Amino acid sequence: MRLSSTNMQARKMLFAAILSICASSSKKISIYNEEMIVALCFIGFIIFSWKSLGKTFKVTLDGRIQAIQEESQQFPNPNEVVPPESNEQQRLLRISLRICGTVVESLPMARCAPKCEKTVQALLCRNLNVKSATLPNATSSRRIRLQDDIAIKMHVLVGKRFCPWCSSKAERVEFIRESLVVLRMVWVGDSLKNKELE
């Protein structure tokens, strides 16, 4: 019954709109220009959407309103009185968390971790200091050992090369040139060392 009454009202409104368009037209023609066509199409679209999509929009909006109401009911109301059971549960939860923290802190690994970290840092620093202190001595001792080896080998080779029956004159000259090159390299290394010390 209600739907039939709304249909009758819509038809009356549409008929009134058509009559007003006819009355406003200069030549008493129902559809005269583009503006009238657009207005008539717009009125028809409104009536069609209201008839066909009105219930869908209403159901969607009702469902959304109900979902919002359910979500708002899940949040606690600040004006609502909290029951003593929930206060007791929160107190027990805080106590259990505090006990867990003390148990973890009392474990041997938890107690030893900071001490082990400090010990490892101290050991690494000491090793670095020892290596940095012994590095110049090691390089200088290696350089001295290298010079001694070169000198010993030079004496042996010179003794062998300068034997009158072991080598010819050309071989002796070539050996002297090689020896001068080696001595020049040693001299350059010593001069660089002196500059570093200065």
From Swiss-Prot:
Mind listing the GO molecular function terms for this protein? proton transmembrane transporter activity
Q: Which InterPro entries match?
A: ATP_synth_Bsub_B/MI25, MI25_plants
Please state the protein's primary subcellular location: mitochondrion
Q: Does the keyword Transport apply?
A: yes
UniProt-listed PANTHER family:
ATP SYNTHASE PROTEIN MI25, ATP SYNTHASE PROTEIN MI25-RELATED
Q: Which family does it belong to?
A: Belongs to the ATPase protein MI25 family.
Identification of the protein by name: ATP synthase protein MI25
